[in-house]
């Protein structure tokens, strides 16, 4: 299964060309840093609820020890 030198070179060049096109395409579709920060800020503020209690789920644990020593002296 031998590969001639020029055929191998063509395959390598095609691979590099595809990778460069893919990299350039994904880079151009990503938002810039300032846009990304703006989007992140909007998402965080959408979850912000002023003047509301902190939501905590009910405890699933049994009765806590409360720091009391249960062993005999």
UniProtKB/Swiss-Prot annotation:
Residues 1-28 form the signal peptide. Mostly expressed in leaves and flowers, and, to a lower extent, in seedlings shoots. Residues 48-73 are annotated as: Disordered. GO terms for cellular component: apoplast; plasma membrane. Keywords: Apoplast, Cell membrane, Cleavage on pair of basic residues, Membrane, Secreted, Signal. GO terms for biological process: response to insect; response to wounding. A motif (SxS motif essential for MIK2 binding) lies at residues 59-61. GO terms for molecular function: LRR domain binding; receptor serine/threonine kinase binding. It is found in: Cell membrane; Secreted, Extracellular space, Apoplast. A motif (SCOOP motif) lies at residues 53-67. Interacts with MIK2 (via extracellular leucine-rich repeat domain); this interaction triggers the formation of complex between MIK2 and the BAK1/SERK3 and SERK4 coreceptors, and subsequent BAK1 activation by phosphorylation. Belongs to the serine rich endogenous peptide (SCOOP) phytocytokine family. This is Serine rich endogenous peptide 1. It comes from Arabidopsis thaliana. The gene is PROSCOOP1.
């Amino acid at each position: 299964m031998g590969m001639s030198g020029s055929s191998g070179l063509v395959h390598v060049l095609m691979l590099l060309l595809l990778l460069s096109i893919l990299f350039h395409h994904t880079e151009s579709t990503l938002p810039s840093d300032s846009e990304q920060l703006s989007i992140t800020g909007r998402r965080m503020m959408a979850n912000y609820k002023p003047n509301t209690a902190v939501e905590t789920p009910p405890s699933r644990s049994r009765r806590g020890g409360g720091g009391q020593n249960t062993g005999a002296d």
